[in-house]
Amino acid sequence: MSNKFKKILVTCALPYANGPIHIGHMLEHIQADIWVRYQRMRNNEVWFISSDDAHGTAIMLKSEKLGITPIKLIKKIKEEHIIDFSNFNISHDNYHSTHCVENLFLLRKIFLSLSEQKLINEKKIFQFYDNTKKMFLPDRFIKGTCPFCSSKNQNGDNCEICGSIYEPTDLVNPISVISNSVPILKNTTHLYFNLPLFTNMLNKWIHSGILEKSVAKKTEEWLKSGLKEWGISRDAPYFGFKIPKFDKKYFYVWLDAPVGYISAFKNFCTKNKKVDFNEFWKKESKCELYHFIGKDIIYFHTLFWPAILEASSYRKPNGIFVHGHLTINGLKLSKSRGFLIKASDWIKCFDSDSLRYYYASKLSNNINDIEINLEDFIQKINSDIVNKLVNLASRNASFIHKYFDGYLADSLGDCNLYQDFIDISKKIANFFENRQFSSVIRECMKLLDLANQYINQREPWKIKQDNFNKLHTICTVGINLFRLVVIFLKPIIPDLAKKTEYFLISDLTWKGIDKPLLSHKIKKFKKLYNRINHDKILQLSLLCK
């Protein structure tokens, strides 16, 4: 990694404001948060922004069902989302909502710019209409069979199985999600963004190194098959922002929501005058911008969104980091399908570091799905964190306080392990930089094996009183090796890192790894982490019913 100071803006896909955060959402926010925390440890200026996606038919219908206004619903949901993210130590610098004055202003500004450039076309089309509910059906309120791979129960705009994008009218055997009736086709008028005009620009952009190879390959397939104009409007009734000069037309959520990245940062800059909005979002910006997203929304972020940014004279992202779906026993977690584990239920059974660590042990920079197995989860946490990491501190700290009044020795003796760990830090830093968190975990476990082997071979518990200097040195080495590993894992397990800082009476910083703690007093060891019991699985399963 370059020593040059960087300015970085990081976003996650916006959670929808019609229900709770589940551990699938948390996968993405934990992945981004680990990367953000690492960048902060390297003294880069990093701003981590997210927001609730607060518009759409689903919110309108849910508020009607609850007998409250959409405004009250999204306010309540946002408060719940913020609590959930806080419980998992997601360090957002600002968490906003797309239902805000900043988003309204930016949407209208962008729409006016697109219109003036004649990039918006008005078309008469046939659209599915629910004759029972007397309303046009948005894409996500139509289910049917994918016209490309024949997967059943797919959305009206894209297939979660093969990733194909299509028109709702292409679906086989469509059904209205709202009334479960067969929709009819009805004439209406909509606005479309001229996406095909940006084909050459997008082709150059996706091959500029900003996408992982598998993501670039998938995007290239869509480009080769030909881009279509992109609908940016929806019919009333709808909860969202009205399109100026178009009666009963509203901005579609896939224009509204990504603009939320910009509006959330705009709101942040309003509250933090030292941060310059234009420095990060102007077209020629030297700052870095990264989007963390799931693989089901690649198309929107690698084609539609960069074209909108290009047309509106905003900068494009330096990278789009894509992760796979989260599965349990092979089934994808999905709020719309009712198969999920709420973050609020998880935190009642397990601490936040445990999920962060388990996710990190499976995360890399590819888009493979991530499988959750609760038995494996418990085994991994108890083995890695309790048996290897925390036990290393416990067994050495007891001698330090029993015989040396809590003070570490003044040297590490002739032990070369400390320098070996420092040498490995460059490799670990590279893994962090490239989001290969599972490799970070593997390297740290190798280091812990070496550290524990060092202690076991020297058997400090057998050393007699006439050789206390040797005992002092061995235990000081053990504590310092423990400290280094916790520094490496600090972005992943912040709660344990904080407890370790209290125990060691020392901040855990990346720049501090070159200087071991010598002639330094530490506190008496208190349990840093509790072993997880298997009865927690039953507790979680009961909460999820």
UniProtKB/Swiss-Prot annotation:
One MF annotation (Gene Ontology) recorded for this entry = metal ion binding
Xref: Gene3D superfamilies: HUPs (3.40.50.620), Isoleucyl-tRNA Synthetase, Domain 1 (1.10.730.10), Methionyl-tRNA synthetase, Zn-domain (2.20.28.20)
Q: The motif 'KMSKS' region: which residues?
A: 332-336
Specify the superkingdom.
Answer: Bacteria
Cofactors, names only: Zn(2+)
Q: Which Pfam families does the record match to this protein?
A: Anticodon_3 (PF19303), tRNA-synt_1g (PF09334)
Would the keyword Zinc be found if you checked this record's keyword annotation? Answer: yes
Broad class of enzyme this protein falls into: ligase
As for subcellular location, the record says: Cytoplasm
Q: Name one GO cellular component term.
A: cytosol
- Coiled coil regions in record: none
Which positions in this protein are listed as binding Zn(2+)? C146, C149, C159, C162
Q: Where does ATP bind?
A: K335
What reaction gets catalysed by this protein? tRNA(Met) + L-methionine + ATP = L-methionyl-tRNA(Met) + AMP + diphosphate
Q: How is the cofactor bound?
A: Binds 1 zinc ion per subunit.
Instruction: Say if the entry is tagged with keyword Secreted.
Output: no
Q: What does the protein in this record do? A: Is required not only for elongation of protein synthesis but also for the initiation of all mRNA translation through initiator tRNA(fMet) aminoacylation.
Give the matching PANTHER family.
METHIONINE--TRNA LIGASE, METHIONINE--TRNA LIGASE, CYTOPLASMIC
The family annotation for this protein states: Belongs to the class-I aminoacyl-tRNA synthetase family. MetG type 1 subfamily.
Q: How would you summarize the oligomeric state and partners of this protein?
A: Monomer.
Q: What is this protein called?
A: Methionine--tRNA ligase
Source organism of this protein record: Buchnera aphidicola subsp. Schizaphis graminum (strain Sg)
Higher taxonomy: Bacteria, Pseudomonadati, Pseudomonadota, Gammaproteobacteria, Enterobacterales
Gene name?
metG
